[in-house]
């Protein structure tokens, strides 16, 4: 096989090359790489590559026994872009570029723009035609274009494609098999989106995909590019959005990859004090170079447009923004203004977001940015970076630290629960409980919780309830929804056998119920980024580790959220109520169905006329130990109707509390006793005596919880040291495939 002998008309003004060198070719993949083409009636493949320092380049592969120089490329522009048409080559043929460096060395490189690649440990590129896939997600795409990106529900299930579930022999599912397994689960659980750890081609399994060598190729570990298209298409058909991790911050030093592509720095910053992350062993892109900007922005748009991905979570943004990131004194140089900001990276991120969201305002651009860099989610025109979402790493760190604290000492750390509200509305935040928090000795989420076996589950249920109600979109890493005890290991599937144990199935049921509640109640997502959607009621009850607040939607509907972060039953807890009327408990983490003690309010709770917390009325409730409760706040019309009925003779009744196990049981009144007034708030002393009877308002005596006959409704014991989960007296069921 010989290359076509034709004179390639070199012209520096050729539009794709011109735009590429200007940093404005945002579809560079259409020109560079390997493309099936017919010339002079002969089908074949045209190859194009950018290599500004190369002396010579040839295409090598099985078709020429990998012989260097047998199929030499020619410069298109007389400068840095090389091209060759080879007749007879076809789809799936393997190839590389053999580059002769200025030092006289031969280096074999995979195609930076390849659409497909060999499966590791092999690393050659493959000719592949991405055109012709029949998409069926028109309805999804149309709905997304009309959706309110910022003020809509977003509840993300973060997952690693290869280790969510595996087949016999510890083999991962391919894209098609995974879709068949994943879609019913995500649909059942009620997540709105899945977020995939990087699926761009990468050589090292242990990098989880964060050391990318193929920025235009879905990893071949699980199938072909069109298999991945089908995976996305099927999720969209099921109403599930797809977000993927995208890694523009750095790339690995593998010899076949981008590193020293033509023997010298091309994609990486040539300055050694800017071009390498020594701690990670990776190279940093030269964000100020136009050709690199074209490469990266083309990659971002490629996934959004060619694979219909709904959004990108941009990895390691903080490492891009700061020249001194993970560098000691003397290992970095200040910018031209004497500062530590990477001005070129800042300009690149603004350009990236302007380009992507300018074309696709309904897509998500999510920054993993772990510092206090200002205005990450504000428009570039206003001095921001232009993302539309940012991970709230501060909230995550504070809350996990708080939840790991023994409840005996949480009173002194109460600020970790409330501090996030000093900045909660400064950015469009996502609350991330991600893969990074359940690896490297950090322990799984449930193993971060203090106490013995059952206490861990109660803590986690309380945390999940608080997280779902806190302003911001949601993200949870796979396995945490059912209480995976082991840390995540990319080489093993999740411990699905745990669903043979009651506590794990109950926790999964709780997560499912929370997800459904979130999706069905706009108060939890419609006004996430303004004080108009949130109001404190009890922010400062640190001694009892209790908080209470309101979430509101634009129609005026409100949800009252009360969290008890202490394993103490609190009877007669009184707090302010925004509207007079009856408050219906709509979710309780202590419900027996979720593995709790069953101390729930089956009947609505009436307000009484005692002003508290800035409101004209209040309610008195029972707080189960270690629990989160949601109450539906009456609308003013509902409250007025209830008040009118209450004025009628014989209609005034006191709210009573039962458990779901005994809905018909009535509270027995003791004759001759006059009810005492409710205290302003339970005291520390009261908290230590859960056996005391609650005092109640004359207008609405507090309900006394009725214990279920099969469970003891008692206060949690003091937390003990962590220990492995105990078997609950029966064999686990087999994991459902």
Positions of PLM-derived features:
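N-terminal cationic-hydrophobic initiation segments that often serve targeting/anchoring roles
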Residues: 186, 232, 304, 353-357, ...
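Short glycine-biased active-site loop of nucleotidyltransferases that positions the nucleotide triphosphate
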Residues: 74, 205-209, 253-260, 377-378, ...
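Carbohydrate-interacting/catalytic domains
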Residues: 1-153, 176-186, 454-457, 466-476, ...
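Conserved alpha/beta catalytic core and glycan-binding cleft of carbohydrate-active enzymes
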Residues: 308-310, 325-490, 498, 519-590, ...
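Substrate-binding/active-site clefts of carbohydrate-active enzymes
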Residues: 118, 138-153, 160-341, 605
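Intrinsically disordered, polybasic Lys/Arg-rich low-complexity tracts
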Residues: 636-737
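Short, flexible loop/turn elements at secondary-structure junctions
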Residues: 51-53, 77, 88, 160-165, ...
